Amino acid sequence: MTIQGVKKESDKKKIALSYWSKDKCLCPVCNKEFDREIMLSGQGRMIAGKLTDELHRIFEPSKRYGRIYPLIYDIGACPNCFTAMLWSDFKDIKNKDAAEKMYSDSEKRRKAVNTVFPYFDLHRRRSLFDGCAMYYLALLTY
């Protein structure tokens, strides 16, 4: 039985934490374009908590959005060659030999990450699981 004026749980709009940028990113290693996911930051998504002794910010969970992990959006990962870097490093690579080495190691990176994170996907919205996989990819890339 439905009550008029009361929305069912499935009818409610899903709360957005991120969006896909209109501008495509160009991978400096394989020269292919891919989508970039950017975290939305307003409306109480990130409630800054205390700093730890290591000066790391703890983010408090909000009632509306729950626990947020903003650090998973700092890494960019190309879904074509599995190159992952900080977004600030995801520009033109000056050393062409390094870019060729990164490209030749792409399958090795994918297999290494797949053994630890077997269900990671670089095409969907990021979860904590996918964010950890991207950090591991970045570790293997650098």
What role is predicted for each listed range?
Residues 1-103:
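N-terminal cysteine/histidine-rich coordination modules
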Residues 91-92, 96, 100-142:
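Extended interfacial segments that mediate partner engagement and assembly in macromolecular machines
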